């Protein structure tokens, strides 16, 4: 698993701040921390499991696209290799999961509209899951009532966009 | 989080046939008008009808040639404007194949709804827009951009038509059968979301049936005369003779628009879905029903009462209607309503199919056709898996069935728990239009 490169993160952050793009792109704000404390777990704890308008994800994780666990919250389910493979297949060929459902640790989610090769969204009762694909990773957010699907999307996809912009 | 409790949101459902708009919280849209627009190219017409017109005269060098052409158009929006014939006025639709293809027309329709019908200032009202289930990301972003940049709305949400219909009946899960004017769409809704991959659509909607009836009547020598095209002359006390009025500068599209209005009313008045598949022999001797045309002609309509609506169930009937030859290539690939329903359900997860069969919701103006519900239920019971418990549900109230999308939007936008879901103006300014994908999944 790649280590978060402090140097490249700082450079990326600086370049973003000086961007001339007319429309500012979303990015997660990275708190300044000592080098020794920078870790993938920090991304999960501070940027995924954070408070959003009084609501919080029930579980979150950043996994490598090979299924390796970079970081996860305490109650993130134990995913199986075939579940990860199913997710990757659906990114490659959207629609493969819809007839069978999306499984995470044995929990079944109905697939709703996502974004081809970028986002998969699932629904289970009033809650659901959002999975954002980045260059090297998969960012997971699992939510339940009263958190809204839009709020989960914001947290997961904002972090995912940031990772993509950082080349990760 | 946008605090949307203060003022009523505006709900807009722009369909391919009609646009519905009104205040959230009310039980029916305040404005209902045609989704088509009259357009006169390139001339400065000396029209006194100022209230219903809008001139897009601001040309810019950066616009493409077609945009320059569009900017010279004089556009006429709304029932009243469309009821008045004008020389060289073409009738245009902003929607092609279910997707917006002309945003300038959409813009004018929205403006008509806000300014002329509802008489509101859009900067003061959050907007809930209903959208088709297969709407593209680009279309959503374009709509968001137009709403925030031009109308400067304080907040926006976009919800899919079948989700709103399902919501209007208090269901989180259902199979929505939306028989609209321009198309028929089957959409499974699960826990408040469309199961995208299982959406099935067909171009056979109410307007197609109207065209079938129009061609069938014309093939029998019946002339459908729009009001502008004839005058009645009293030849004897109490006796009138109809004379055609020659108005050569009327466009074919406007003539067709007017004929469709007349034939659409005939269809709505007398058509009835047959209990079993239509065949010519069984219906050759049935009693006729009378209908008086605007020119005083009385029609006697027999088999067509049952033949035309059966097109929804057996599209191949179209081949037997003179004048519908141009659809010969398209028809073989179109399936009837019961098959579309089963096709959609079979694309869904096995675990929810049973629930979908027992919650089939009818929606859209064409679904109000007499006996359509009963026929669909009967056909599905016969053809669906034995384990399925088929139940076709439809509001007994035709207004609710016709406007179910709008009504669902009205309910949704009024909910306290919905208020945290708005895509606010400040979020748009910070993140841009693409944020709509996250805020309104």
From Swiss-Prot, chain A:
Gene3D superfamilies: Dynein light chain 2a, cytoplasmic
MF (Gene Ontology): actin monomer binding
Spans annotated as Disordered: 14-36
Pfam families, per database record: Profilin (PF00235)
Tissue: Expressed in roots, rosette leaves, cauline leaves, stems and flowers.
CDD domains: PROF
PANTHER family named among the record's database cross-references: PROFILIN, PROFILIN-3
Subunit structure: Occurs in many kinds of cells as a complex with monomeric actin in a 1:1 ratio. Binding to the poly-proline motif of formins induces formation of oligomers through the N-terminal hydrophobic residues of PRF3.
The name this protein goes by in its record: Profilin-3
Organism: Arabidopsis thaliana (Mouse-ear cress)
UniProtKB/Swiss-Prot annotation, chain B:
One GO BP annotation of this record: chromatin organization
SMART domains in alphabetical order: ACTIN (SM00268)
Pfam families: Actin
Induction: Before cytokinesis.
Source organism superkingdom: Eukaryota
Keywords, ordered alphabetically: Chromatin regulator, Cytoplasm, Developmental protein, Nucleus
One function term, GO molecular function aspect: structural constituent of cytoskeleton
Localization (cell): Nucleus; Cytoplasm
Region spans: Disordered: 48-73
Tissue: Mostly expressed in flowers, and, to a lower extent, in roots, seedlings, leaves and siliques (at protein level).
Entry's Gene Ontology cellular component terms: cytoplasm; Ino80 complex; nucleolus; nucleus; Swr1 complex
Record-linked Gene3D superfamilies: 3.30.420.40, Actin, Chain A, domain 4
Keyword Nucleus: yes
Record field: compositional bias (Basic and acidic residues): 60-70
Job description of the protein: Involved in several developmental processes including organization of plant organs, flowering time, anther development, flower senescence and fertility, probably by regulating the chromatin structure.
Family, as annotated: Belongs to the actin family. ARP4 subfamily.
Record's subunit section: Component of the SWR1 chromatin-remodeling complex and of the NuA4 histone acetyltransferase complex. Interacts with the SWI/SNF complex. Interacts with EAF1A and EAF1B.
Stated name of the protein: Actin-related protein 4
Organism from which the protein derives: Arabidopsis thaliana (Mouse-ear cress)
